[in-house]
Amino acid sequence: MKFIVKPHPEIFVKSESVRKRFTKILESNIRIIIQNRTESVAVFNRRDHIEVSANSHQYYQQVLEILTTTPGIQQVLEVKQSDFKDLHDIYEQVLELSRERIENKTFVVRAKRRGKHDFTSIELERYVGGGLNQSVESASVKLHNPDITIKIEVVDDKLNQILAHHKGLGGFPLGTQEDLLSLISGGFDSGVSSYLHIKRGSKVHYCFFNLGGPAHEIGVKQVAHFLWNKYGSSAKVRFISVDFEPVVAEILEKVEDGQMGVVLKRMFMRAAGMVAEKFDIQALVTGEALGQVSSQTLTNLRHIDVVTDRLILRPLINWDKDEIIKVARDIGTEDFAKTMPEYCGVISKKPTVKAVKEKLEAEEANFNFDILEQVVRNARQMDIRDIAKESAQAAPEVEQVQAIEEHAVVLDIRSPDEEDDSPLEIDGVEVKHIPFYKLSTQFGDLDQSKTYLLYCARGVMSRLQALYLQEQGFNNVKVYRP
């Protein structure tokens, strides 16, 4: 098993020193994730590309997923690599691998070459293509729009026959840009905005303002952990939770109805700015889009921005909602966002779309800012890697089982795509598939006289969901860990 990883082209327009630093960081990121998830897979930096190889295909799917979800990679080539003696040897190797592929098909050979050789790339294409055309009678050469394109690369004394081409994530390697603090709510917007900055090379830390109690926090932690685990697990990042209910209570009591939405957003930014300053983070990230809600008009955004000296980044500012949802679907956060409650919109009945500075300041003069400072001081921070551990510790009564008791039902809570790729079938056991994002609404409709064993691939989501269900009063749930 061998993959050739091509870094994003923007890396190569940098100066030599920056290019070397970026590719070294990319190599390190790949190695960290691969070592955490696989065994006996080697990573080598070859200056203009990175090679990932192993003696077996045992971890093929895991490695391919890692490489196609790691920021900074433009494309991943799956190759068969070998030594060669001369042009004819290359032709014979290509014939052995491609003979069956081109039978009764039109084909073309495309070659790239780097190093010192006694032939050019065009000569290589002509020699190999001509040889294949003579050796496979049912095949024919077609230079434009052929059925099969045979791609080969010759690098010094190595021949790479490209078996498959996989699109990478693009962007910059994680850690090449400065850290950011994302104001995450668990909805469509904040998940996508966080992802976009991970893709661009920033370590994204998460700040959650809790307005909905433990269940809301569990849901948001799931989103943050998912984003980190899928796209940025080479980095150590923080999850900070701020209990904002006292702040909301003070706003409801002291601030005029029409100003509540903008004042709440200003309090978010003040608090996030304090958190960012504590960790020496220069910028905040939000999922705000222009005009999406009343607090996101240009006038209101300007009034929101002035309360902190941190740079506020809004990568979705000109996006339509359907565009945001499409990206959420593509990156895997849509299912989380579908069932995430929205709390911010409920506190103002007639929100202003064009706040006035003097009126905002007059309303905030009634606000007790000691409350804001207190909730920030009491904020709880954790290493995002500990979210899985916390789920087990927070709910020690959630039993994990390997054996399935009589009459128990296994609930496969993986997403439909995961379930389709690897269906869970257990002889003699009833298995139901309810995706995790539907569990909260559908679990109550099940036969509550039975015991339900929650299953997911790694056991993280099943523990978090079991905790949530037990908080709702369901004590007939366990975690199935075969």
From Swiss-Prot:
A Pfam family annotated for this UniProt entry: THUMP
Natural source organism: Vibrio vulnificus (strain YJ016)
Stored PANTHER family: TRNA SULFURTRANSFERASE (PTHR43209:SF1)
Predominant location: cytoplasm
GO BP: thiamine biosynthetic process; thiamine diphosphate biosynthetic process; thiazole biosynthetic process; tRNA 4-thiouridine biosynthesis
Family of this protein: Belongs to the ThiI family.
Listed GO MF terms: ATP binding; CCA tRNA nucleotidyltransferase activity; tRNA binding; tRNA-uracil-4 sulfurtransferase activity
Metabolic or biological pathway, per its Swiss-Prot or TrEMBL entry: Cofactor biosynthesis; thiamine diphosphate biosynthesis
Residue positions binding ATP: L183, I184, K265, G287, Q296
Residues at the catalytic site: C456
Protein name (record): tRNA sulfurtransferase
All residue ranges annotated as the Rhodanese domain in the record: 404-482
UniProt-annotated location(s): Cytoplasm
